[in-house]
């Protein structure tokens, strides 16, 4: 009986340590969470999905872009404005900016890389009226705002500035909303 009691005591002591160890909390370093945003005093707020969007222009054969002014098929994208109050502003235009192709203020230059970039091609943006949007601080055509959510449509094309050569053809533009 005494041996059984001692065996039970030893077993209990050993398993108690295991049970305690199994329930111990382990904490490791994680990372940083960046919260990004802005409080605005304007007619609308830009939807978070419109901040950093990617417009996929796809693959276009260089043969299609072999002369100055040749274009690819247009690809649509929108800039969405939320919580709009048409009493504050009746309309909005979008101002795009970015590096323009030399001599063409309405064609966005491609990002240059050491090797592998397409040449003699850029990106051109048109607004909801079909008007080409310059990159010089001029706003797109005014879009009439309604209360609530507004989706302002645009289109982008590859635009040849000469005989295009094959390669990566990425470009970046920033935008601002100009309320009118």
Swiss-Prot record:
InterPro entries according to UniProt: Adhesion_dom_fimbrial, Adhesion_dom_fimbrial_sf, Adhesion_dom_sf, Bact_Fimbrial_Adh_Pro
Entry's localization field: Fimbrium
Swiss-Prot/TrEMBL keywords: Disulfide bond, Fimbrium, Signal
Keyword rRNA-binding recorded: no
A biological process term (GO) from this entry: cell adhesion involved in single-species biofilm formation
Main location group: other
Superkingdom of origin organism: Bacteria
Pfam family, one: Fimbrial
Disulphide bridges, residue numbers: 44-84
Residues annotated as signal peptide: 1-23
Gene Ontology, cellular component aspect: pilus
This protein's record includes keyword Protein transport: no
Gene3D superfamilies the record matches: Fimbrial-type adhesion domain
Family as reported in the entry's similarity comment: Belongs to the fimbrial protein family.
UniProt-listed PANTHER family: FIMBRIAL SUBUNIT ELFA-RELATED, FIMBRIN-LIKE PROTEIN FIMI-RELATED
Cited function: Fimbriae (also called pili), polar filaments radiating from the surface of the bacterium to a length of 0.5-1.5 micrometers and numbering 100-300 per cell, enable bacteria to colonize the epithelium of specific host organs.
Record's protein name: Type-1 fimbrial protein, C chain
Species of origin: Escherichia coli O6:H1 (strain CFT073 / ATCC 700928 / UPEC)
